[in-house]
Amino acid sequence: MLETSQTIPELVNWTREREFSLSLSTERLAFLLAIAIYNNERLDGEMLETDLIDIFRHISNTFEQSAETISTRANNSINELVKQRFLNRFSSEFTEGLSIYRLTPLGVGVSDYYIRQREFSALRLSVQLSIVADEIQRASEAAEEGGDEHYWRKNVFAPLKYSVAEIFDSIDLSQRMMDENQQHIKEEIAELLTKDWQTAIASCERLLDETSGNLRELQDTLNAAGDKLQSQLLRIQDCVIGHDNLYFVEQLIVDLQAKLDRIISWGQQAIDLWIGYDRHVHKFIRTAIDLDKNRVFSQRLRQSIHHYFDHPWFLWIAQAERLIDLREEELTLREEEALGELPEELQYESLADLHEQIVETMQSLLIEYRLQNTPIDLSEVLTAQLKQYPLAKHFDIARIIIDQAVRLGLAQDDLNGIYPNWRSINENGAEVQAHVIDKY
């Protein structure tokens, strides 16, 4: 940051004596930014009161305020900006009623913060570093030639102090603006994750990737120029060693080296912090969607299916196989009665009969478990049972078995909070996720 020769008590007393105060509402800030942009478009940098009123009229329309009091509110806003030293007002007996306004350094600084500093890019950083490299190169060559104190102040100290140092401060301020932008992106991601998940995930990926790419590109630019700049500063530092009268140059070199180190170091640290945040967001999404330990999404899905006809919804499927429509629209219904007997393998078998058979099987397993203290592996039970039935009945069979398994007992791993693995139970890709039942 810029150095100051004043102490904290001196600055505090100076501020108190002049009664400095800053207070800008959203409307007043928009007015100041509009004035700054309009001022940049003028060659003389001077504005009349009528110009400011026209600008305020546009601001008032944007904020949907009353048009009847524009003149009064415009004068109040102009006077407030003058009072807070954002604008300077000039008038004389020759220009009575036609005051001239110019932005003060404070007005330029505030508007520059909101306008120019947000235009931070790798191209701008590259141009700034190129200018710095040229200035330091000329200063190092002048230092090696040597001269009296006036020569050093003019050819070495001045370029480093008023060009290189100010560009370093500009880069440092831009980094702080990017810090603020990262916080804004984090808030935006947090808001997205509380809304529509389908849109949120895609938007989060885009924001994370864009920010990571920007940080990496800017840091690569800094790293490429950092070593060269440090070597040039060391050349100048070597030239002032042993010259006590050039202490001001040596102190400036130390300050510049510290600034450059701080800029490069914080750039890398910002990347590391963002990578950690990126991983945290992805871990949160995976945990919330894939693991779902509390079965919150599963419960909501069951409720949505149950109330589908009252509240219809769309189902998004990722990498789904093509669904085959088995209906033949050209076929007509046959109203003839079916005569004869069905083959034995096609005869209807009610779920009640299946339920009784499976209950008997589970009871035999229960007796074996109680007699021999043998754990029941639910995946093996399902695999063995499903082999005895056609694929069309697998879902009902599995549902009945699982229902009985819940009544049989508990798994110690469930009590320990261990997450079970998925295991295949048929040749068509069906899987089950359950621990071995070992506590009756």
Curated annotation (Swiss-Prot):
Keyword Cell cycle: yes
Predominant location category: cytoplasm
Pfam families: KicB, MukF_C, MukF_M
Subcellular location: Cytoplasm, Nucleoid
GO cellular component terms attached to this protein's record: cytoplasm; nucleoid
Regions crossing the membrane: none
GO BP: any one term: cell division
Segments for region (Leucine-zipper): 208-236
Cited InterPro entries: Chromosome_partition_MukF, MukF_C, MukF_C_sf, MukF_M, MukF_M_sp, MukF_WHTH, WH-like_DNA-bd_sf, WH_DNA-bd_sf
Gene3D superfamilies: Chromosome partition protein MukF, middle domain, MukF, C-terminal domain, Winged helix-like DNA-binding domain superfamily/Winged helix DNA-binding domain
Keywords (A to Z) from UniProt: Calcium, Cell cycle, Cell division, Chromosome partition, Cytoplasm, DNA condensation
GO MF annotation, one: calcium ion binding
Role played: Involved in chromosome condensation, segregation and cell cycle progression. May participate in facilitating chromosome segregation by condensation DNA from both sides of a centrally located replisome during cell division. Not required for mini-F plasmid partitioning. Probably acts via its interaction with MukB and MukE. Overexpression results in anucleate cells. It has a calcium binding activity.
Subunit structure and binding partners: Interacts, and probably forms a ternary complex, with MukE and MukB via its C-terminal region. The complex formation is stimulated by calcium or magnesium. It is required for an interaction between MukE and MukB.
Family under the similarity heading: Belongs to the MukF family.
Name of this protein: Chromosome partition protein MukF
Organism, scientific name: Histophilus somni (strain 129Pt)
Lineage: Bacteria, Pseudomonadati, Pseudomonadota, Gammaproteobacteria, Pasteurellales
The gene coding this protein: mukF
